[in-house]
Amino acid sequence: MPANRDIRVEAVTEAVEAKASDSEAAVIDEHVRRPLIGLTPEQLSEVAVSVAVPRFAGKPMATSVDEMTDLSKQGRIRLAQAGYVVGREEPLASTASRDGTVKYLFRGCGGRDVESVYIPEKDGRATLCVSSQAGCKMHCAFCMTGRQGFHGNLTTAQIINQILSIPQSRDLTNVVFMGMGEPTDNLDAVLDTIEILTAPWGLAWSPKRITVSTVGNIPGLRRLLDKTSVHIAISVHSADAEQRQALMPVQKAFPIREVMALLRDYDFAHQRRLSVEYILWDGVNDTPQSMRVLARLLRGTDARVNIIPYHPIGGDSLRPSSRRVQENFRDGLNDLGITATIRASRGQDIMAACGMLAGAAKKQQPPYQDEE
């Protein structure tokens, strides 16, 4: 882990928390909270200027732990008076699985909280699955999150807080945007989070430690591909257009063949990896014909297929394929030249497995509706 693991957050922490015991600080309006942990150096510089801290102090806010003395006592007071806070909040709750997986509940938006999942591996790797939205607009038939409706986009601070505020934060080797929400539907916040994770002034992670999963929003996917070098995971689940649309309404707007055509224009043979997520359902998409159609769809790409066991969420007729069928599907793809593996199911006993995240309602509130 880089030595500057908490550079930007701890630097801001020193600035803001230093004022907490300062009797000269004015009373802060508790309703005005402006988190700093989701800001880029340029944005932090703007904050410094806005509260009359010398312009040069904006950069140390983002890059230095020990040099926060560059912020005067009065400067720290002015930060607090303007409503700025670190924005680092502990999880509201956590639930541990028998397999070591831990599900965390965080404050969300729109009357909903959100969940993230810590997944440790025996080989020392540790992955955090983060959420980007409260609820989701995609309405996939097999996903609990989609059934909650859409309640709002998380801010950059709320996303990065999931990563920085769990007890195992320093142990993380990977972050995957596979929690609640569609990342490309909240792309500005997701891109800012990736910048914070990968930039030298931030946590200095390699982009290879980050994977973004998407249903295939083509404009958002193109922008993500152009602006980052992170790994990409595409939720396919069926290569048959009619069947996929029944499972994933997004197919109507962004046909999977057009998504794959876009991906063929990018290099996934070297540093960046492309994977395809494919949940198997008994008698739906687990047949030899389904396998062959999927293999044809993926020709000309360097995609690897992650076969995912279905975790029933109730309220539908979908059933998981047997282990034997999963293995036959995997072996058949491998025989056709498509690398395929079966993803190990983690956290199912605490409703933390793929497709099972739902968050919690803080109060009764209808789903958010975009203004027409």
Task: Mark where each language-model region is.
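Short beta->alpha linker loops
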Residues: 154, 216, 345-349
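Short linear Ser/Thr-Pro motifs
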Residues: 94-97, 131-132, 213, 235
